[in-house]
Amino acid sequence: MGANRLVAVHIDEETLGASGPDAEHERRVAIFDLIEENTFGVIGEDRGPYVLALSQHERRLVFAIRTEPGEEVHTFILSLSPFRGVIRDYFTICDSYYEAIRMSTPHQIEAIDMARRGIHNEGSELLKERLEGKIDIDFHTARRLFTLICALHAGQGRAPGA
């Protein structure tokens, strides 16, 4: 395996707060999938593979990156403001999706799921743009990281289904 990848991802448990079983499962799957297959390179660095600690502090997203042995590489701090609208839309469509699973036809569920994936893709592209020049990630890595960003945001007082 190459050096431009993540070998571990840690999420600040204090930021996460309490979450429901659906959100917790989605987070675990995203981390597992992320570790299994990802592209993650810190621009200007060649010390990978990397360990990522993801947290939220004062309405900012914190990417603390270390080498596998634990040497600090870089900490990137991004404003969450550009993500607020897409995260809000994502939670709204997730609420609709979980409701549809209980009460709707397969066709309706599929339509809502397509919309959910579309919003998720939008958030993933936004993340790639915001990390441009800092961290090189592929689209699939961005999708999984966006899932984790939503989990952090949910821990700050808004969770799907709430």
Swiss-Prot record:
Pfam families: UPF0262. It comes from the Bacteria. NCBIfam families: PRK02853.1 (NF002769). Belongs to the UPF0262 family. This is UPF0262 protein HNE_1347. It comes from Hyphomonas neptunium (strain ATCC 15444). The lineage of its organism: Bacteria, Pseudomonadati, Pseudomonadota, Alphaproteobacteria, Hyphomonadales.
